[in-house]
Amino acid sequence: MRLISLLLFVLLLAIQYPLWLGKGGWLRVWELNHQVQEQATRNQMLKLRNAKLEGEVKDLQDGTGAIEERARYELGMVKDGEVFVQFVAPAPKVSATPPLPPPPNSPAATGRH
């Protein structure tokens, strides 16, 4: 009886191995499902990007507004009679040389006022 139980247990393990660790086992199925989800996410991002680019292409083909906007912002073009004004924030002043130390006999150097 003990031999039959041991034989059945070994047979059960032999059957379970391909199910869990084999070529088409659960671990491989889980990995493939994970890859499919990642690819679906990438595909969705690319679809959104393609839709945006398609809209830009249609704008450039159909209307002059998009062309004018690109010419203004990317190339700095202006219409006749317009004046281009650009406000630039001033850069912080940077001293080229460090300040000189006070002379040795001055009140600032001795600590007396």
UniProtKB/Swiss-Prot annotation:
Residues 93-113 are annotated as: Disordered. Its main location: membrane. It is a single-pass type II membrane protein. Keywords: Cell cycle, Cell division, Cell inner membrane, Cell membrane, Coiled coil, Membrane, Transmembrane, Transmembrane helix. It is found in: Cell inner membrane. The keyword Nucleotide-binding does not apply. GO terms for biological process: FtsZ-dependent cytokinesis. Residues 22-113 are periplasmic. The chain crosses the membrane at residues 4-21. It holds the Pfam family DivIC. Residues 34-63 form a coiled coil. GO terms for cellular component: cell division site; cell septum; plasma membrane. Essential cell division protein. May link together the upstream cell division proteins, which are predominantly cytoplasmic, with the downstream cell division proteins, which are predominantly periplasmic. Belongs to the FtsB family. This is Cell division protein FtsB. It comes from Cupriavidus pinatubonensis (strain JMP 134 / LMG 1197) (Cupriavidus necator (strain JMP 134)). The gene is ftsB.
